[in-house]
Amino acid sequence: MSQFYCRENELRKLNKRYEGDKFECIVIYGRRRVGKTALINEFCKGKPTIFFSALNTTGKENLEALSKSIMTFERPDMESAPEFRSYDAALDELTALSKEKRMVFVIDEYPYLAKAKPAISAMLQHIIDHKWMESKMYLILCGSSMSFMESQVLGKESPLYGRRTAQFKIAPLDYKETAVFHPNLSDEDNSLIYGITGGVPHYINKLDVRDSVDEALLDNLFDRSSYLYEEPANLLKQELREPAIYNAIIKAIAEGASRLNDITMKVGEENSVVSKYLKTLIDLGIAKKETPISEKPGKKTIYLLADNFFRFWYRFVPVNMSAIDSGRIAKTYPHTVKQYLPDYMGLIFEKMCQDYLLYYADKLPIELNEIGQWWGTDSKKKKQIQIDIVGTPVEGKEYIIGSCKYRNEKIGVDELELIRDYASVFGKGNTYHYYIFSKGGFTDGLLQARERGEVQLITLEDLYK
């Protein structure tokens, strides 16, 4: 399955702008491995294209690479290409090429180029304003550093601010899009594939599930020779100068530490140091910072792993390292990995259920403003509680309250009573609509409560309909 699969909407929009024959500056960004370059390559098929992939090196070496890209386009039969003396000269050559004919110019890994040649954004701004705006140039700037792309390309402080004609933030596939890769597998298997890969097309392909998720994990992840086994370490080495500390932070979060103090204690560094590293992990799309829905960032803020593949890897690979090294993982897998998958899938299932409600937002009893989790203290019982799903209204005081259970047991009426109690602790609404999601189904008592209109019940199979 190709990596641009399920990117038809983005591809259609890119092609529509190409047909316009006027200057375009398209910004494409998103975390690594999500399929940005595959999307661009698919779009560029059959179109006159100069594709320049910037290098994490010096400005001079990037100029050499850019020169080669341009000369390869102009004279594909040349064995060696002359180098432009300056970036201005290279950009002027691109101006000449796009003056009369439509041409695509891609700068992939743009943050690398901007780091190597800090003036490049200002140079592009100048040539766009004075030459390319009247040309047939179709410029694509692509990058994986999301904070850089948002601040230094799209942000108001950037020289390029206002020059873009469109931008695409490429996100991982959702659970339904991920399932299209394996239409013959069960809903449970497809949910596991989503939970392991996070909907990243590259990881879906590398996991390569044929008949069994268990077999695919043993062959393509829990094996030292496999691509996915080495992926986290390779990605951290590629992106970061001090992978050891980042590695410790990711491992701490994967093991359940979510508050800054807890992470700091596990890592053994100061809060200020860990905060700095967390910011970088958030920028890379590996970690995320979350606050209870409808509340401002503060003491309740927690850190989670945004990348499901990293979360899975750090949850199950380090603790099974000796079994992997000794070749015993196939024997230990049932009781060291498989039995813990339902627990691991808990957070994943919550996200799937939230996405389900967003899919069918027009059928909900309220006009949905946002959806997320809420956690806080039950002052009467003096304990912490968490509500898996809270849907807030655009206006009024009607809320959606939901519970998500990824387990084989049927869920009973006691779960409805529990989320009613939680709703009263939440306390922001005067009317609540209750939703319970369950992989294992529901008891007769809870089904009867649904018949009385007290609750909406959704199974795993319902999510995939």
Task: Annotate each PLM feature.
Residues I293, I302-K465:
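A cross-kingdom feature that marks ATP-driven nucleic-acid transaction machinery
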Residues M1-A330, P334:
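Phosphate-binding site recognition
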